């Protein structure tokens, strides 16, 4: 993977190898994840977003495969810019089941140790908010989509 950001490249390669060990036929597409030279979002923060998003997507694909061995598993990660806003989108297959608590804005982890797990989306949201951005997600059928928006503006990286 070559995105223009070393941290993103390392994470993508690491997570890809982790995923194919347990889901050999998973398709991971990051061709449209690109970072320009005038990126004002710190690499560490990009790593927090991509690392947590990929962990969640890989776990969702694992769960889908465990329930339906013939299911197609995929993760697509892309980025784009609109004005001064930078977006990262992660789309992945999942089993179609979303568990939420009434007051929770994010799906609830299904892992038994929910104190150590279930923080990924909250970490992504916190990171996006550092750049005056936010997080949105949708689930349609068996496709989960996470969208992260951040302001990519000179000086933002110094506020964080």
Which stretches of residues belong to each language-model region?
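Glycine-rich/acidic phosphate-handling loop/turn and adjacent ATP-lid/helix
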Residues: 84-118
């Amino acid at each position: 993977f070559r995105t223009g950001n070393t941290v993103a490249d390392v994470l993508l390669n690491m997570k890809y190898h982790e995923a194919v060990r347990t889901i050999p036929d998973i398709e991971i597409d990051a061709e449209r994840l690109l970072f320009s030279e005038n990126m004002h979002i710190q690499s560490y923060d990009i790593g927090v977003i991509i690392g947590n998003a990929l962990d969640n997507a890989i776990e969702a694909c694992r769960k889908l495969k465990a329930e339906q061995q013939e299911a197609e598993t995929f993760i697509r990660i892309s980025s784009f810019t609109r004005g001064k806003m930078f977006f990262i989108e992660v789309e992945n297959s999942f089993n179609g089941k979303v568990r939420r608590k009434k007051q929770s804005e994010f799906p609830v982890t299904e892992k038994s140790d929910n104190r150590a797990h279930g923080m990924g989306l909250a970490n992504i949201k916190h990171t996006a908010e550092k750049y005056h951005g936010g997080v949105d997600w949708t689930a349609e059928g068996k496709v989960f989509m996470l969208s992260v928006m951040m302001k990519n503006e000179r000086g933002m990286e110094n506020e964080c």
